[in-house]
A protein has these predicted regions:
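Canonical Rossmann dinucleotide-binding motif of NAD(H)/NADP(H)-dependent dehydrogenases/reductases
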Residues: 2-34
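Active-site-adjacent segment of SDR/Rossmann-fold oxidoreductases
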Residues: 29, 128, 168-178
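The beta1-alpha1 cofactor-binding region of Rossmann-like NAD(H)/NADP(H)-dependent oxidoreductases
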Residues: 40-41, 61-72, 104
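Substrate-binding pocket helix/loop in short-chain dehydrogenase/reductase
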Residues: 98-99, 106-108
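Active-site helix of classical SDR
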Residues: 122, 158
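Residue(s) in the substrate-gating loop at a strand-loop-helix junction
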Residues: 143
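SDR active-site lid
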Residues: 175-250
Length: 282
């Protein structure tokens, strides 16, 4: 999609962080943007900030882990703008910790927001993008943790799922004139560590109190420091805009974890090398 100007974009998790950065970049490129978030006060503030720049934006509150609310948000977008060309599945939560700390509520919340909402967004908005025949683009936010695993297992599983979904969807939708990109950010200055502020009551118990000692305490310190020195969300937004315009399959924010990804694929190749030359028993 070389020309974003005049197109309509729907962005989830748009009240702050990466979502607001993406919405800002698209609006500055001339797109009409529907902002969607669960955090209503912050959502209205974001809309006001963008309207102050003469951007054509509106907002709709939705809990994307509820398919019905996401569908209602799509209907509100069509009522407001008539068409949708760009879908940005960006809403996300931090997720649970390592083995031994999991809860059913934690898995349900993490998968509901980080993965199921992406699937539902595509199910709901895909036909709307197809319907006008003008082409479009879908961006889904995974994470660098969707390519290399850490200690937040539920989070990793959800983000690996977004990568796999995006890769498969890209092949499916290319003949229909719809591009697909997966955003895999590493450290970005966001408030993801305070995701629990928006925890719906039905997921009570999903977030455990942080440990103040041991490996998890050190991990939290490392992540906190990484986020503090991370990329500006507005910079990430510009990368996403460029990725949409040039149909990038993968959008990264820096090269900090490149060697870790290379090491993972080297380990996978070693697995093949161990059996190379053997004849499978049929």
């Amino acid at each position: 999609m070389k020309d974003i100007a005049g197109k309509t974009a729907f962005v989830t998790g748009a009240a702050s962080g990466i979502g607001l950065g993406i919405a800002t970049a698209l609006a500055q490129a001339g797109a009409k943007v529907m902002l969607c978030d669960i955090e209503e006060a912050a959502l209205k503030t974001a809309r006001a900030q963008l309207e102050a720049t003469n951007a054509d934006v509106d907002c709709v509150r939705a809990d994307v882990s509820l398919k019905g609310e996401l569908k209602a948000a799509a209907e509100a977008t069509i009522a407001r703008y008539g068409k949708v060309h760009i879908l940005v599945n960006n809403a996300g939560v931090g997720g649970s910790g390592p083995y031994g700390t999991w809860t059913d509520a934690g898995w349900a919340w993490t998968m509901g927001v980080n993965l199921h909402a992406v699937v539902w967004g595509i199910e709901i908005f895909g036909p709307l993008i197809e319907s006008h025949g003008e082409g479009g683009h879908i961006v889904s936010t995974a994470s660098i943790a969707g390519l290399i695993s850490g200690n937040s297992i539920a989070y990793n599983v959800s983000k690996y799922g977004v990568v796999a979904l995006s890769e498969g969807l890209r092949n499916d939708l290319a003949p229909r004139g719809i591009g697909v990109s997966v955003l895999c950010p590493s450290f970005v200055r966001t408030n993801i560590l305070s995701s629990a502020r928006n925890l719906p009551p039905r997921f009570a118990g999903a977030v455990q109190p942080p440990r103040t000692d041991g490996p998890m305490s050190q991990r939290l310190k490392t992540v906190t420091e990484g986020l503090a020195r991370g990329a500006d969300p507005r910079y990430v937004g510009e990368l996403v805009r460029e990725g949409i315009e040039n149909d990038w399959p993968y959008i990264f924010t820096d090269t900090e974890f490149e060697r870790h990804i290379e090491a993972r694929f080297a380990a996978i190749k070693q697995g093949f090398d161990r059996i190379r030359g053997r004849t499978p028993v049929r």
